[in-house]
Amino acid sequence: MNIRLMAAALLASVAAPAFSANAADLEVTHWWTSGGEAAAVAELAKAFDATGNHWVDGAIAGSGGTARPIMISRITGGDPMGATQFNHGRQAEELVQAGLMRDLTDVATKEHWKDIIRPSSLLDSCTINGKIYCAPVNIHSWQWLWLSNAAFKKAGVEVPKNWDEFVAAAPALEKAGIVPLAIGGQPWQATGAFDVLMVAIAGKDTFQKVFGDRDAKVAAGPEIAKVFKAADDARKMSKGSNVQDWNQATNMVITGKAGGQIMGDWAQGEFALAGQKAGTDYTCLPGLGVNEIISTGGDAFYFPLLKDEAKSKAQDALAKTLLDPKTQVAFNLKKGSLPVRGDVDLTAANDCMKKGLEILKKGNVIKGTDQLLSADTQKQKEDLFSEFFANPSMTPEAAQKRFAEIIAAAD
């Protein structure tokens, strides 16, 4: 997509003033549509409405892979929303370079974002050529294995404490009519599971060499071969999932139809909505119980450039609201994510969130792949792992060869 060629059309379209019955209405687009996510979004909307403005919800059903092209098309096509969700990283890079997004540096400076946002890499991901273009709202980590205590009780085995024990328990789960590992059909779920396995099995340094340094030799080497072996185990264990959306896979764990799920901490919102309690109804293993490391992925809001002064002021108000301490707590407790502020009260956090906070405090973190790789490279990864998990005839060796080629060509 050549965004720069479309920029002139958008700038012309926003040159004329917009007319609205209520100039403080602000459309906010996002892809948070599951039950737990919707409850979290409601907290953001409530906080923003309290400023005297009005949150106009622009939820787009489906994953980020479905929503982002729609969001980008609107911005480049001259129909920008007031604010839009993207993940931490490079997803809005071309939009910023094309001059289509607002510079939030003044707001960030007045609100002291550099002093309150932790880790600092989150704000770094919002910064291009020294200017800040987004407001981070949470830290979401992929590195979690969620386990159904009821499923393992039914299968007559102890709840696993790590990935190897989980793999060993798979036959007992299958014998009890339980799918060992729930993975939905959306491509991002398969590639996310692989990335989690890499951190757990190959370690933090190897993860950085492959995705940060884009070292194709390491990607083709023996350490990553072990990861592909584990991915092959995961593929076999997930046979029979037969669901598409991530929250449907989470529901299989909640209802005891599946033993576990590799999924980010946003899954906590679904467990909470179902009235389940961490440690009693389900178990969470950060780093798959092998390497207690979490990624600092998550979400941020970007603000398209508008010429309507009232809406621009509403954008300022929203940016400030997103980082307000009370908003941070209310939103993240329901979202299952960690706040980006290091100075908020999280005494109400559940056991799993407390584990994440402790890991974050220790500094056992890595950047998310969205922060390290371009959207195009991420899409190539998704295509590969979607095929790998769906096609049992693709060998781990063949998949690793293709993976190394993707890393070699990564930008």
Predicted regions and their residues:
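Short, solvent-exposed loop/beta-turn-alpha elements that line the ligand-binding surface or hinge
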Residues: 105-118, 201-226, 273-277, 286-293
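Conserved N-terminal structural module of periplasmic/extracytoplasmic solute-binding proteins
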Residues: 21-98, 110-113, 159, 276, ...
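Mature extracytoplasmic/periplasmic domains
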Residues: 106-109, 266-270, 299-376
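Extracytoplasmic/periplasmic substrate-recognition and gating elements
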Residues: 24, 46, 51, 155, ...
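Hinge/lid segment of periplasmic solute-binding proteins
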Residues: 89-142, 167, 193-195
